[in-house]
Design a protein with these regions (language model features):
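Asp/Glu-centered strand-loop micro-motifs enriched in Gly/Pro and often flanked by an aromatic residue
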Residues: 35-49
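Blade/loop signatures of beta-propeller domains
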Residues: 19-31
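A contiguous, well-ordered beta/alpha segment that forms the leading edge of an enzyme domain
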Residues: 42, 70-97
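Basic/aromatic DNA-contact patch characteristic of tyrosine site-specific recombinases
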Residues: 13-14
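Predominantly the structural core of cysteine protease catalytic domains
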Residues: 2-5, 10, 31-33, 39, ...
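Alpha-helical support elements that line or immediately flank enzyme active sites
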Residues: 47-71, 164, 170
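Catalytic-loop motifs flanking and including active-site residues across diverse enzymes
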Residues: 49-50, 54-58, 80, 99, ...
Length: 256
């Protein structure tokens, strides 16, 4: 039987306090025509049959930040991030998804330790890690997080962030065509026909590069798509009904 996927990411509610990563903050000279940050990341993970896409997207961003700081290629504890995020959103004891704002806040409040300290075991999806693990997590706290505005400028903002070396975690509305055999085989995502296709729900992924399209890391294992990755058109990211939310994390201030 085909693997069952969960689509229960929640859209961020409006919060005027969000620090925005707009055009001015991400001003660049001549950005490269293409960027590919996959070599700084471990093999694509598989979230399994729980709705932990938000934690997988956040862990990819954390892994890249650690690599940038000279820490090598690591796997952050996806389970720890999934649990702390849901704990703070009041949904630890159910699998009802989470928001990306809650994810970045948990990354800043608790940190995300290496997966060697708290492996990805979904039987522990509804319990907090022991205090010793949470104490170690504090060494890996995100110091900054910024929201990328959705809308027509989003594809360019994604590219500017990626050109500056920041992976972008994002939440999107997905439709039937995303689960098609064609996408699973080749990793090329079409624009959905929202008038005729069924809405699957919300899903978090991470943009890790671009050329003509944006290169996206999923969390359905390396057998799906292009080694676990897919390519999505700019039009998807420019549509605020499809792209819900987008964030970057950093260990330092971005811009001035």
């Amino acid at each position: 039987m085909p693997e069952s996927h969960v689509f229960n990411l929640k859209r961020d509610p409006v919060d005027r306090r969000d620090l925005m990563l707009g055009i001015g903050r991400m001003a660049v000279g001549t950005r490269p025509k293409s960027v590919d940050l996959r070599s700084a990341l471990p093999a694509v993970w598989n979230q399994g049959d729980v709705g932990s896409c938000f934690a997988h997207a956040g862990a990819a961003c954390q892994a890249h930040q650690v690599f940038k700081e000279g820490g090598g290629i690591i796997t952050p504890s996806r389970l720890c991030l999934a649990v702390t995020t849901r704990h703070d959103e009041g949904t630890l004891h159910c699998d009802n998804g989470a928001t990306l704002r809650g994810t970045v806040k948990a990354m800043a409040r608790y940190g995300v330790p290496p997966e060697t300290l708290w492996p990805y075991d979904v039987s522990k999806y509804f319990e907090l890690p022991p205090p010793a693990v949470l104490a170690q997590a504090e060494k890996w706290q995100a110091l900054r997080y910024y929201r990328i505005p959705v809308g027509r400028h989003a594809p360019e903002l994604f590219r500017r962030a990626l050109a500056a070396g920041f992976i972008v975690m994002f939440g999107a509305a997905l439709y039937d065509s995303f689960e098609s055999e064609e996408v699973a085989a080749a990793g090329r995502v079409p624009m959905p026909n929202t008038a005729t296709e069924a809405l699957l729900g919300g899903h978090a992924m991470a943009a890790v590069g671009y050329d003509a399209d944006l290169l996206v890391r999923n969390s359905w294992g390396p057998e799906w798509g292009e080694g676990g990755y897919c390519r999505m058109p700019d039009a998807y990211f420019a549509d605020p009904d499809l792209l819900w939310d987008a964030w970057v994390i950093s260990l330092t201030e971005i811009g001035k």
